[in-house]
Amino acid sequence: AEHQLQALLYACPELSEIAVWSRGGEKNQRLVARYQPKTETLLTAAKTLDVAAEGADIIIAATSAPEPYLEPQHLEAASVYCHIGFHEITHAAIERFSDIVVDTWQEAKDVSGQSLFRYYREGLVGLERISSTLGALLLGTKTIPRASRDHKVMFDAFGLPIFDISFAKIACERAKKLQLGTNVAW
């Protein structure tokens, strides 16, 4: 959740409030206490999922939940849902989305334990429900309408090694520029 909070604060500085909810005790309170001094965005530690989801434009789920907890009512206000964790969302909630975008499909459809891929293997979500891959959107070979409360978009991040490689490349370039680290001959 910490990395998602950092990403939101960086990519969406115009957000007026971010509610943080945790399935496990006071983790959300510690996260809010650590990041509130670093931002003008109001951070709140929501006591319940219902409170966190109420009025939220964007919902990001990043847990290791073994059973889904996000129901259709949690998505009433949301226009974008980012599924980064394991098994957070019910099939009924997935049915609320106009578009579903995945970072990868082929590599994940038969092996991932994430909600979307489970429902696909169970025959509850068909391939026709997948609007695009992230790559196709970035390349401009596919488009989807802008997300809104009436046109909800789900993004499922299975997680590709290419992202790890990309981040490693950036880290190495920065380290070289700052003359940090040790050169290793391969």
Predicted regions and their residues:
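NAD(P)-binding Rossmann-fold cofactor-contacting core
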Residues: Y10-P37
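Conserved SAM-binding loop of SAM-dependent methyltransferases across substrates and taxa
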Residues: E2-A11
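Rossmann-like adenosine-cofactor binding region
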Residues: T41-R121
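Adenosine-phosphate binding glycine-rich loop
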Residues: I94-W186
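Gly/Ser/Thr-rich loops at beta-strand to alpha-helix junctions
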Residues: A1, G25, F158-I162
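A short helix-to-beta-strand connector/capping loop
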Residues: K38-T44, R149-D150
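A general structural motif
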Residues: L15-E17, A78, F97, H151
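Glycine- and other small-residue-rich loops at beta-strand/loop junctions that grip anionic moieties
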Residues: V20-W21, C82, A157-L160
